[in-house]
């Protein structure tokens, strides 16, 4: 649970900004996106392999 403490006289916009910053730092949104778009491990490995081949070809062509 994310807790944002407010100081006396602090406005709501500043508190929301603090909350958003803490929310991003915890990585909750990334975890939710990752869980919603589940990718099978075999597909993940295949995509990583394809990306590695592409990156290697790209780096070799730059020489």
From Swiss-Prot:
Recorded superkingdom: Bacteria
GO-annotated biological processes: translation
Keywords: Ribonucleoprotein, Ribosomal protein
GO molecular function annotation: structural constituent of ribosome
GO cellular component, one term: ribosome
Gene3D superfamilies named in the record: Ribosomal protein S8 (1.20.5.1150)
InterPro entries assigned to the protein according to its UniProt record, in alphabetical order: Ribosomal_bS21 (IPR001911), Ribosomal_bS21_sf (IPR038380)
Any matching Pfam family: Ribosomal_S21
Entry similarity comment: Belongs to the bacterial ribosomal protein bS21 family.
NCBIfam families for this protein: S21p (TIGR00030)
Protein name: Small ribosomal subunit protein bS21
Originating organism: Azobacteroides pseudotrichonymphae genomovar. CFP2
């Amino acid at each position: 649970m994310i807790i944002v403490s407010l100081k006396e006289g602090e406005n709501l916009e500043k508190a929301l900004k603090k909350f958003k910053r803490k929310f991003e730092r915890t990585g909750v949104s990334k975890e939710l996106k990752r869980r919603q778009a589940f990718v099978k491990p075999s597909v993940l490995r295949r995509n990583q392999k394809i990306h590695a081949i592409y990156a290697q070809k790209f780096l070799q062509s730059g020489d």
